[in-house]
Amino acid sequence: MPLEQELMTEILGTPKDDFLASVRGALGRSTPSNPSPPYFRLEESLTDLEKMEQDLKERLLADHDQRINALVESARATAWNVNRFPNVEEATSYISDLLTTLGVQHAVRSNQPIFHQIPIDELLNDLSIESSVIDQIGAGQLSHTQARQKMIDADIGITGSDYCVVETGSVVILPRAGLSRLVSLGPPVHLAIVSPQEIVDTLDDVFLLRRLDYLRNGGDMGSYLNFISGPSRTADIEQTLVVGVHGPKEVHMVILG
C-alpha cells in the first residue's frame, strides 16, 4: 500500500472501497449494485415556471381563512406558540405582553419588510428593552464579531418570514443582506411575524418560487434555506429528546390578518 494511502487509512480509518465491500458482504452481495442515475438538470423555462406561478397565485387566493387555520394547526403540532390577529394594533399589544412576561431585556431583530408594517422598534423602546437591528454588518454599524455576540446574548430574536408552509408548519427564511440565521438561532426565544401573503401550502410551492428567483436573478438563489419547524430538538442514541440545544427552546408565531 502506498505511503499516502497508508497515512489516509490511519487518519480516516477503513478506506471507502473496503468499507463498502464489507457492507456488501454483510448483505450477501458479491458485486456492487448499479449506481443510481444522476439527477437531471431542471429543464423548466422561465415561461413554464411563470405559468406555474400564476396557477399557484390563483390557488392561494382561494380558501384564505381555511389555509391560515390549517397553518395554525400544523404549526402548533410542531410546538410553535401560534397567535393570529386581525390587525397590527392587536398584534403589537400581544407582543408587548409577551416580551413583558418573558422578562426580555435584550432583543435583536432582522431587517425585513414586515417591520415597516409593525412598530417593533417603538415598542422595544417603550418597554426599555435594549435592541439591535442586525443590518449592514461590517458597514460601519456592527462588526461581524459584535453582531454575533449581540445575537448570542439576546433574550429574544425577532424576524419576519419569507414563506410559511402549511404542510410542515415551518417558517422559511432566505439569506439576504440585513438578515443573519443567528437572529433566529442564537437567542433562547424566537418570535416570527408572518404576513398572509407569505403563506403557501407545500414545500413544492417554496421550491417553485425559489426556482423562479434563480432564473430571474441570474442564477443566484443564495447559499441556504432556513426552515424553522418549532423549537430546536436533538436526541441521543437512547432517543432522549432535548429541546433548545442547537437553537431556541421556545418559538412564537404571530400571524397578521
Question: Language-model segments: what does each one mean?
Answer:
Residues M1-G257:
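The feature marks the mature, well-folded catalytic cores of soluble enzymes
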